[in-house]
């Protein structure tokens, strides 16, 4: 089995404008590479629903990655739109992933219940929204990545077809 390919989208108006350094995207890269995944694409985009949706769709449709991880845009700010962009282009929602991450994160911060993160599948790519803070990215991704690997194997037609075990 070859390494899973990962694309990373950071949603940040200030990051896109060069006014803030992206720390969450590199945190994602560090974690996935430490787990044997290959990062094939990274991009910083503004909090613009249409731009984000178009990039998510392009990555999935052009088979750029097996796993697309996004960071940022999942909160209550008026410009936060990553879940809406994600859900507008995925073909199948996977609500259990963000539900589990929110539940896990409650032990670190009650504010995690304010996350609007979403997840879904388009073609053969799993799309997962992560929080915008590097600390929350690490907590969520380190928790979820072992289970995500099983889902990715299933999308590839490898491994057990049993989600329940």
Task: Locate predicted features.
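Non-catalytic beta/alpha edge segments that cap or flank active sites
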Residues: 1-165
């Amino acid at each position: 089995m070859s390494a899973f390919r990962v694309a990373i989208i950071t949603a940040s108006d200030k990051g896109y404008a060069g006014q803030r350094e992206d720390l969450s995207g590199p945190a994602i890269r560090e974690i996935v590479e430490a787990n044997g995944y290959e990062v094939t694409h990274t991009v910083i985009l503004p909090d613009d629903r249409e731009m984000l949706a178009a990039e998510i769709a392009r990555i999935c449709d052009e088979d750029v990655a097996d796993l697309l991880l996004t960071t940022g845009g999942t909160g209550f700010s008026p410009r936060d739109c990553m879940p809406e962009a994600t859900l507008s282009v995925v073909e199948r929602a996977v609500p259990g992933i963000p539900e589990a991450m929110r539940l896990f994160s409650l032990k670190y911060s009650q504010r995690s219940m304010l996350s609007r993160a979403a997840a879904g599948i388009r073609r053969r790519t799993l799309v997962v929204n992560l929080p915008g803070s590097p600390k929350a990215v690490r907590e969520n991704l380190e928790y979820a990545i072992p289970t995500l690997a099983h889902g990715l194997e299933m999308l590839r037609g490898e491994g057990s077809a049993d989600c329940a075990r």
